[in-house]
Amino acid sequence: MPIHAAARTQARLPAAVAFVREFPRLLATRIERSASPAARFLDPAAGRGQWCATRFYKLMPLAPEILSELRQRLGADNVLTSQEDLIPYSFDGTAALLQMPGCVVFVTTTEQVADVLRLANRTKTPLVTRGSGTGLSGGSLPVADCIILCTVRMGRILEVDRANLTMLVEPGVTTLAVADAATAVGLFYPPDPGSMKISTIGGNVAENSGGLRGLKYGITRNYVMGLEVVLPDGEVLWTGNKCVKDVAGYSLRDLFIGSEGTLGVVTKVLLKLIPKPAAKKTMVATFNAMDHAAQCVSDIIAAQIIPCTLEFLDRTTIHCVEDYAKVGLPLDCEALLLMETDGHPAAVEDEAAKMAELAKKNGAMAVRVAKNEAEANSLATARRSAFSALARLAPTTILEDATVPRSELAKMIRFVAAVAKKHNLRIGTFGHMGDGNLHPTFLTDERNTAEMARIHEAFKEIFDEAIRLGGTITGEHGVGVAKKDFLPKFAGDAQMRVMRALRGVLDPNRILNPGKMFD
């Protein structure tokens, strides 16, 4: 860093520290002015039923004996308790949800995780596991008086096994680091959530994360071959192995994937890798109607073409992304499809030509082929930046992920637009059109209580319609807090009964991530 830049940074530090220390008071003042019936996140006195919250709870320190034992086992530097240190862990990527934890602890080994869990279980102290905090359903949000178990320092890639096409990692390794390590040895790790630069593998496993390439390559579950998990009582369990085929007993590995930290804490992940595709081709097609884009997607799938990426942006999102990323997206259209095919060079050329032909048949205004790898990457980056681009338009951005069968996609897109008009809401919609996963993104201000109430009604209508069309309330973001009130309607009584029974057996004291998924 240049000396003058360092001096400027040093000069700013006192002001920055003062702001962090003052932040709770400023936030409390804002909330006192804007508190509403929506302020219900994990508040026993307020009841259930609202999606979002604006209340910032006061810090409630854990019992001194618990903190003392944590410091003894982990070291004082690995236990955070001051208010300014806890603020960054009081929220995740979910808009408007806030709660101060009792403390934050950093762990580096499985043994330390087991020690913390034994303590939490013995004292019946709630514990919430956290990676990078990029989740979009409130899955890693604290509850009052809880221990936040942060795994970001468990960040080692332990083994890359080229003979068996596997990689063994700790939960704090970022998704991008896994992908880069695979690429370095000529292999490929396909799952690519939008936050892959900072999201951790542990979080990906907890949420069963998807990504842009999910249509062809699947989601996180398809690439987990084994897990080391610490159970709530501190017992360490290994499930899975490097075998391609293994049908011995229940698939406990699959039980923990997508369980959102409610059944155990993942401490190691054995990942499957695949050969890197030899070639790829990226294209952008623009349409003057969203229905035409949706029909193009249906025709591509009907032609038995499975692209690795088949994404869409609506008009609002296109303009926001271009203003944000400046990659030369066309602005004179209502819908944009980002299409990418990969594999053998001859197959790639054939599929790309067929997709371009189908796009034109469905009224595409233009089909643009990326000229080189750099242009292809910039187009993919533009799509990945959709959420960030939309977030600049309003103080509060709420991203959802209702998912429907591909055959119902056009109906669902029209329904979202109708809901936005009915409730007078601003919504930008983008998502994984190839697998029916929509991301309607609400642009609002959490202080506008009347609009937040309308958004809550809009969510209910969108999720009800997704279920009616044979879809789901979440394709990749998880249930967490944001959608737990919608889960019983989607899952039904029998599934809810089985899930509650499983959770009760593994975690009878209900210490792990309480208040998430279901009560």
Regions found by a protein language model. Give the residues of each.
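Short alpha-helix boundary/capping segments
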Residues: 1-15, 33-37
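Aromatic (phenylalanine/tyrosine) cluster motif
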Residues: 19, 23, 41, 56-57
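N-terminal flexible segment immediately upstream of the FAD-binding catalytic core
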Residues: 56-118, 122, 135-165, 194, ...
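Alpha-helix capping/hinge segments and adjacent helical runs
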Residues: 75-76, 467-479, 508-512
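C-terminal substrate-recognition/cap domain of FAD-linked oxidoreductases
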Residues: 81-87, 271-275, 281-458, 465, ...
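FAD-binding subdomain of flavoenzyme oxidoreductases
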Residues: 156-311
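Activity-critical C-terminal alpha-helical subdomain
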Residues: 235, 484-519
